[in-house]
């Protein structure tokens, strides 16, 4: 069953791209360019990747990543799949994306990070995972909100402080 599932997912990637080209090919007028057709099929793949991150479909996410799909691809709002998986509470997807090099410090069009999304949605286990890298140094340079400022605005500053203290204790134990 697992082999069949993997074959099915791989075929989605291949057929999805081909289907998009065939579907658009029917509507080609002399004014339409090959670049537009290719952009449409690429956008469909991006949409599928984001949908998988949103609903927590780790099989689709892992299949895309296995075939070299860009882990930090963005949608029109500047969200990354990491932000989407975080916001919807899919810790397994978050772990997989991080393992494949997802940028924890990426900011959306409003200047928010995945960690901010985790705090907003009270996904503290995911927040703990994301907080392993401090992304605030760059925020201070660019005039964007730091995680602490964001946490204060949404009333989660105590949770953030607790998270930071837990991580500091864990680091102190490992250094001994």
Locate predicted features.
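Intrinsically disordered, low-complexity regulatory segments in ankyrin-centric signaling systems
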Residues: 4-5, 16-67, 168-176
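Conserved hydrophobic site in ankyrin repeats
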Residues: 64, 97, 130, 163-164
């Amino acid at each position: 069953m697992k082999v069949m599932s993997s074959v099915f997912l791989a075929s989605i990637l291949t057929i999805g791209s081909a289907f998009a080209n065939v579907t658009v090919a029917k509507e080609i007028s002399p004014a339409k360019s090959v670049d537009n057709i290719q952009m449409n099929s690429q956008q469909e793949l991006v949409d599928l990747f984001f949908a998988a991150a949103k609903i927590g479909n780790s099989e689709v996410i892992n299949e895309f990543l296995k075939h070299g799909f860009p882990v930090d691809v963005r949608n029109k709002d500047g969200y990354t799949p990491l932000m989407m998986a975080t916001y919807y509470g899919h810790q397994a997807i978050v772990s997989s994306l991080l393992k494949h090099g997802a940028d924890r410090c990426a900011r959306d069009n409003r200047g928010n990070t995945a960690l901010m999304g985790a705090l907003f949605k009270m996904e503290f286990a995911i927040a703990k995972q994301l907080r392993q890298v401090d992304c605030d140094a760059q925020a201070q340079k660019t005039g964007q909100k730091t995680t602490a400022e964001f946490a204060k605005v949404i009333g989660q500053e105590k949770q953030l402080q607790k998270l930071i203290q837990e991580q500091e204790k864990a680091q102190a134990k490992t250094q001994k």
